[in-house]
Amino acid sequence: MSQFFYIHPDNPQQRLINQAVEIVRKGGVIVYPTDSGYALGCKIEDKNAMERICRIRQLPDGHNFTLMCRDLSELSTYSFVDNVAFRLMKNNTPGNYTFILKGTKEVPRRLLQEKRKTIGMRVPSNPIAQALLEALGEPMLSTSLMLPGSEFTESDPEEIKDRLEKQVDLIIHGGYLGQKPTTVIDLTDDTPVVVREGVGDVKPFL
């Protein structure tokens, strides 16, 4: 049976944030709010927790996970960022974007896209997500909470509780969220490529 925390969406209670981070550090899988709906998260190097997430979402081998980072400095530790990419991201983070970048040796090999050695990176603006990452002190392995058979990210924490309370360690209720996905931008080459248009404005990358 999972725990269920009500955390204020604008002013997260630090006591609950610390408890949530402790669950992650001990190998737990959590449901938490982001800019684009709820997500599943775990510690970056915890293979068992990652496999639990794969079972919950019925993900295929080689699924492209995302690393949630608190800021660009942390993002730059886990991915190769040139000057052009850095300027673009600096002007558009935190926010509703996922950036595809080449991963550094800090990223476990099993998380990198097999052929291109890339990884999705995000700097969320959601206050709860930011507070979690600040307290954790490292990126969190993450994927959108899109349950099998659904085309949309889950947005209702009460429904999530009904469906997942026996499969995850913690569900954070951070309000009812939108369902539109992030905009995905590939920054591995000199020219940015819009892979998916979502909530984030694509104009800065065209």
Swiss-Prot record:
Q: Which residues form the YrdC-like domain?
A: 14-200
Molecular function GO terms recorded: double-stranded RNA binding
Pfam families assigned to the protein according to its UniProt record, in alphabetical order: Sua5_yciO_yrdC
Leader sequence residues: none
Q: Which domain of life is it from?
A: Bacteria
Q: SUPFAM superfamilies recorded for this chain?
A: YrdC/RibB
Q: What is this protein called?
A: Uncharacterized protein YciO
Q: Which organism is it from?
A: Escherichia coli (strain K12)
This chain is encoded by the gene named yciO
